[in-house]
Amino acid sequence: MPAKEIKYDMQAREKIMKGVDTLANAVKVTLGPKGRNVAIAKSWGAPQVTKDGVTVAKEIELEDKFENMGAQMVKEVASKTSDKAGDGTTTATVLAQAIYREGSKLVVSGMNPMSLKRGIDKGVALVVDELKKRSKTISDKKEIAQIGTISANNDATIGNIISEAMEKVGKDGVITVEEAKGMETELEIVEGMQFDRGYVSPYFVTDAEKMEVRLDDPYILLHEKKISAMKDMVPLLEQIAKTGKPLLLVAEDIEGEALATLVVNKMRGTLKCVAVKAPGFGDRRKAMLQDIAVLTGGNLISEDVGIKLENVTLQDLGTCKKVTVDKDNTTIVDGAGNRADIEGRVKQIRAEIEETKSDYDREKLQERLAKIVGGVAVIRVGAATEIEMKEKKARVEDALHATRAAVEEGIVPGGGVAFIRSIGALADAKLPDEEQQGLNIVRRALEEPLRQIAANAGCEGSIVVEKVKESNGTHGFDAETEQYVDMLKAGIIDPTKVARFALQNAASVASLLLTTEAMIAEKPKKKEPPMPAMPSDMGDYD
C-alpha cells in the first residue's frame, strides 16, 4: 500500500479553499446573459467553446490532490443540480463558493463548524419555504417559451421550439434532441404511439415510393409468443377478410408458414395486412404490448390469461384510426381504447415511476407513459459547424430540462432576484449565537448570484445588489439591457425547482467541506533517476 500524506485543520481548509476557488472562478464567468465563454482544449480537433457551467466544471482536474478534492466536491454540486433540475449549475457553484468562503473565515476565528452547519441548514430550509411561497405556476405557452429562452442563453428560437413541442405532446410527452442534417433547428411531432419495430417483410408495403405501409381503421392483433403455424389463425383471418378491414399483427416473431400466408393474401388483395415484431424484451415487451392493448381497446393474446390464438374473435382485437409502418418504426394513431382504462394504465405507470430506484427503468417507464399520453416530439438542432452543433445541442437539452422543471414546480423572478427577496425570511429567525452566524452565512451567500451576474455584465455588483434590495416584489436588474425592470414582465424567470436545488446542493456540499478536519491523499511517487547512458566506445571484444 503506497504511503499517504495527511493535512489537518488550517492547512486542509486552505487547500480546499484553493481548489473550490480554482473551479468556481472558471465556472462563474459564464453566469447571466452577458456571461463569457470558456474554451476547452481537446486531445484532438478544435477546442470546445461553451457557456455551460457544468461542462466547464466537468473538464477541471487539478494537479494538487488536496486542492482537487475541494474542486471535485464543488463539481458534484454542479452535476447534481444539472441531473435533478437541468439548469442552475453555475448558480449552485457560486453559492457553494460563497457559503464555504464565509464559513471557513468563521471556523478559522474559532467557531464550531457543526454549529455553523446547523445554522446553514436552518437558513436554507427557511429560504426554500420562501421560494415555494413566491413560486408562480405556469401553463401559458409564452411563459414556457421565456423559460426555454433564458435556459438556452437567451436564444428565443430554442425557447419557442420547446414551448411548441410541450404544447403538442403535453408535459408528460417525450421530447428528444437530435442533430439535424442542415443549418436550421426544427421540430418534428410524431403523433400517437410509436415503437421502434418495422415490418418483417417489404412485401407488405402499400406505398412503394416511401417504402411504408399505411392502414386506415385496421384491426390490431397482439400476441406475446411467436406465430409460425397458420392453422390457428385461419378462422380469425376469414372473419377479418369478410369485414374488408386491414390487419396489423404484432407478435414476438412471425415466421415460416404464417408469414408466407399473410404475404400471399396481401399480394392477392384478399387481406390488406402487415406483420410487425413486438417492441422491447422480456417483461418490458409484455408491458408494452399491454399498453398497446389498452390504447387500442383490444386484448393481449397470452396463455397467462387463458386466451389461445384459435379461440380469438373480432371482439379481442384492438382498433385505431390509422397505422403507419416503415422499415424501422410503427406508429398507431388515435387508438379506440376506453378513456377510463387508459387513465388507469397511466396512473399505474406513474406509480411505478415513483417507486423505481433504477434511472434506466425510470427512463423506460417515462417513455411508455409519454407514448400512451400524447406523442413524441423530436427537436432537430442545426448549426454551421460541428463545434457550434455540439454547443447548441447541449443548450437545447439544458433548456428542455429547465422548462420541464418550471412546469413541475412553477417559476420565480430570475436574475438572482428570488434569492434577494428570500433574505427577508431569515430576519425573524432567532438562533443560538454560533447557529445565528451560520444563518448569516446563508444571508450573505444569497446576494452572490446577482453580484456575479452584474459583474459579468461589467457593472459594480455591490451597487446593483443594494438597488435591487431597495425595490420590492419582482423588480430586479436586467443584465442584458442594464436596466431595472419587473422581471416577470420582462420574461426573466427561473424555475423554482432550479433555484431550490441550486441552494440545497450548494449548502449541502459547502457544509460538508466546512466540517472536514483532515484530508488524506497518496504521496506523489518520487521519480527514479534515469539509468546512466552506456559508454559510446566499448572497445573491441576478441
Swiss-Prot record:
ATP binds at residues 30-33, 51, 87-91, 415, 494. Residues 523-542 are annotated as: Disordered. The keyword Nucleotide-binding applies. Keywords: ATP-binding, Chaperone, Cytoplasm, Isomerase, Nucleotide-binding. It is found in: Cytoplasm. It catalyses: ATP + H2O + a folded polypeptide = ADP + phosphate + an unfolded polypeptide. Gene3D superfamilies: GroEL, GroEL-like equatorial domain, TCP-1-like chaperonin intermediate domain. GO terms for molecular function: ATP binding; ATP-dependent protein folding chaperone; isomerase activity; unfolded protein binding. Together with its co-chaperonin GroES, plays an essential role in assisting protein folding. The GroEL-GroES system forms a nano-cage that allows encapsulation of the non-native substrate proteins and provides a physical environment optimized to promote and accelerate protein folding. Belongs to the chaperonin (HSP60) family. This is Chaperonin GroEL 3. The gene is groEL3.
